[in-house]
Structures are given as structure tokens and as C-alpha cells.
């Protein structure tokens, strides 16, 4: 039975990878100008001889690559948060991590944009970490029900959004415009430098994931049971929280405030993959990547010549999905 599940999981992972590759190639082809598949393939074979080098290399490739990396980061972080909080509707944007990172990023854009832009991810990570620590303080105060923890997270997110809106009203018009574009979640202006930064962060946290993955089946159990089986529960939680906070904060610092990916991707992944936690993590990463690539593709082609941020389409699907989970998930 286990072998049959593993085979199915492998097939699903391969299919997801192929689908991600196909949708990425389609995204390379479609935009303000259509580039035939043959010319896209020629660019990959010999970029320097391609007549579409500028469009593909400067405008589309960085954007698609960043969408894949950001989606993967958000998908993995969502799965880890649901595991740590033992709450099926936990996600970075719902429990306030995204809000904390967004507030810090907007503070940077509004008041410190004259400094190097490379400090923006650092500000976002610090904001996300503060939000997570506040949530942990509430969790360690006693036996808080999962629903209560989610309500606290939503309250924090609402507070952060209110503070962001206040900043946008009082700051300079140009800075406010930059912050607004970032807040709605757009991949416009993505560069290969952005993809390198996020790619390096993801690679840097891989060793932390290897510490977590082998023990995930035990950590899913209730804390007393896991401790009885020899698991350092608090250490495992801390590793996952640090990893997920870094991934979320770095991703949204580069692509903006794209919500609900960390909620949707893990649920779809857990529905498709029934086996190991490692495969669920990989599937969450791929579902997250696919969702942002598709949302960005729709956003920049559906209303040409105008462009709608990817975050708008993710939210349009994610909000009803969240309500559905609230109505159907048991034992909250």
C-alpha cells in the first residue's frame, strides 16, 4: 500500500513539474507582443542570436523565474506554519507575518528609499519576525484554541494594514505610489538580481529543511506524544518558524504583498500527495509557483495594454477558498 502511494505521489510530482514548465513557456510566449514557440526555443538554444533577446531576457524571463521562486517560498512556508500551529487554515497572510513584513517594507519605501534598495528585504524579514514573535507570545500564554489563534492573527493583520494605510496617506506622493504598487503584489520590473537574491535565500534554508523533514511525521502528533517519542518539539517548531518567516518575508519583499498562496498551495498539495512530508513540501512549492505564474500571466495579458497585478487574481480566488475552509474544516 505504501509503495503504491509513493508511486502515485511521484507521478503527481512529475506531472506538476511538467505543467509548471509548460505554463512557464506559455508565459514566455504571451504578452504585449506574441513570440512563437519556435523563437522561444531558439532563445534558449542560442540567446545571443535571438531577435527576441531583449523581450525574453530582460522583460519576461526574470519575471517568470521570480514568480516561480516566490510561489515556491510561499507554498513551503504555508505548509510549515500549518504544521507548527497544528491549524489547517494557518498561512502567512492570515496570521499576520505578511502584514508585519509589509508594514516594515512600506516604512522603508516611505522614509528610507534614499538608501540602497537592497535593505528592503532586511526590513521585511525584521517585520515578519516581529509579527511571528507576537503571535508566539499569545500561543505560549496558555491553551489557546486554533480558532482563537487565527482570530488574533487576523486582528494583527488588520492592524498592520491600518498602519500601512496611515503611512500611505501621510507620506510623499511618489513614495506612496511605489508602496501601493508593491502592496497589491506585482512582478512588474522584476530583474535577475531579484531572482538571484531569492534563489540564494531558498538555497540557504535548505539545510534547515533537511533537519526538519525526517521528523515531521512525529511533530504532527500532539506535543506530549511527540516529546515522549524523543522529539525536541520546541526546537523543531523554532526551526520551522524561522525558516517560514525568512521565506515569506524575502518573497514578499521582492514581489509585493501576494496573499493566500501560503493557504491554497499546502491544501492542494496535501490533497494530491498522501505520502512523505518531503513530497508534500515539494508539491506545495510547485503549486505555489504555478499559481503565481498563472496569476501573473492572466494579469499582464487579459486587459492589454493595461496590466493587473498578480496579487489581485490570487486574492480573488483565495478569499472564497478561505471562507470554504472555515465552513468545512473540522475541530477548530
Region locations from a protein language model:
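Alpha-helical transmembrane segments in inner-membrane proteins
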Residues: 1-332
Amino acid at each position: 500500500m505504501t509503495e503504491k502511494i509513493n508511486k502515485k505521489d511521484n507521478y503527481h510530482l512529475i506531472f506538476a513539474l511538467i505543467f509548471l514548465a509548460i505554463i512557464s513557456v506559455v508565459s514566455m510566449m504571451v504578452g504585449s507582443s506574441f513570440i512563437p514557440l519556435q523563437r522561444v526555443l531558439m532563445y534558449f538554444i542560442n540567446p545571443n542570436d535571438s531577435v527576441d533577446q531583449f523581450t525574453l531576457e530582460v522583460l519576461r524571463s526574470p519575471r517568470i523565474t521570480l514568480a516561480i521562486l516566490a510561489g515556491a517560498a510561499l507554498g513551503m512556508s504555508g505548509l510549515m506554519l500549518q504544521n507548527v500551529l497544528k491549524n489547517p487554515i494557518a498561512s502567512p497572510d492570515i496570521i499576520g507575518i505578511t502584514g508585519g513584513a509589509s508594514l516594515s517594507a512600506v516604512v522603508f519605501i516611505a522614509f528610507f528609499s534614499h538608501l540602497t534598495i537592497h535593505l528592503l528585504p532586511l526590513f521585511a524579514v525584521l517585520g515578519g519576525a516581529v509579527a511571528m514573535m507576537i503571535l508566539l507570545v499569545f500561543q505560549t500564554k496558555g491553551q489557546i484554541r486554533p480558532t482563537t489563534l487565527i482570530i488574533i492573527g487576523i486582528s494583527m493583520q488588520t492592524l498592520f494594514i491600518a498602519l500601512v494605510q496611515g503611512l500611505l496617506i501621510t507620506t510623499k506622493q511618489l513614495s506612496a505610489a511605489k508602496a501601493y504598487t508593491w502592496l497589491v503584489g506585482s512582478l512588474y520590473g522584476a530583474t535577475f538580481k531579484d531572482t538571484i537574491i531569492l534563489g540564494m535565500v531558498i538555497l540557504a534554508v535548505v539545510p534547515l529543511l533537511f533537519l526538519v523533514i525526517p521528523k515531521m511525521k512525529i511533530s504532527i502528533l500532539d506535543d506530549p506524544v511527540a516529546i515522549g517519542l524523543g522529539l525536541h518539539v520546541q526546537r523543531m517548531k523554532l526551526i520551522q518558524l524561522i525558516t517560514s518567516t525568512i521565506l515569506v518575508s524575502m518573497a514578499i519583499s521582492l514581489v509585493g504583498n501576494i496573499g493566500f498562496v501560503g493557504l491554497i498551495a499546502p491544501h492542494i498539495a496535501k490533497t494530491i500527495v498522501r505520502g512523505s512530508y518531503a513530497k508534500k513540501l515539494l508539491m506545495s512549492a510547485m503549486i505555489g509557483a504555478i499559481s503565481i505564474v498563472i496569476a501573473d500571466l492572466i494579469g499582464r495579458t487579459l486587459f492589454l495594454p493595461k496590466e493587473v497585478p498578480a496579487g489581485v487574481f490570487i486574492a480573488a480566488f483565495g478569499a472564497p477558498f478561505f471562507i470554504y475552509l472555515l465552513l468545512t474544516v473540522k475541530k477548530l
